Amino acid sequence: MDTLKILKKRAWAVVIALLAALLFSQVAGVVQSSLSAVQTSRLILLDAGHGGSDPGAAGLDSMTVEKDLNLAIALKLQHYLQQAGYLVQMTRTQDEGLYGPDDANKKRADMAERKRLMEESGADLFVSIHQNSFPDPRYWGPQVFYRKGNEDGQQLADCVQKQLNAFTAPNNTREIKANDSYYILLNAPMPAAILVECGFITNSMESESLRSEAYQKKVAWGIYCGIEE
């Protein structure tokens, strides 16, 4: 008789445990669905600067050009964001300019097309990826710019700058900077827009790092973490 009671108690314990597990999985599913809904309701427009006939800044060696680094980092950032459930739109996904074969002024046509994409995307965030340059090769370090007077952009820039420093350049003393002249920022209609200079392509050590896929992943991850923050 005692053995029967013990078996019944064990059976009930198993039933209760199974019900609890089922309930937990259902609740977890609802929470996860809610989080995914929040994330996927946010659209991010990623802009890999330059491309095609516009190489952007050049490194100390002729093999290193800005447009290639911009695209490599932007594609990695796209992957991280999509894995997290964000909707992502790209201005370009390959080495091409945003202009037509008959456009006389390709740079002007390219910037006009980027402006159109920004206006029609309906994105919540805009992130433009670039590489910095300076005649003096001593200068280094990532820096994030935002449109002057754009508080949401300033907040996003601050978060991205902190995370970039943490993952790629702990000793970097550069701070976020307001800008009132960058065409791409001045014409961004979304609530928050930033331009990320990932590093100085004219600094030999930083340029070597930026060409490394492992370092590009760190840069992309730093930007992603700043967006998540």
Predicted regions mapped to residue ranges:
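Catalytic-site microenvironment of enzymes
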Residues: M1-E229
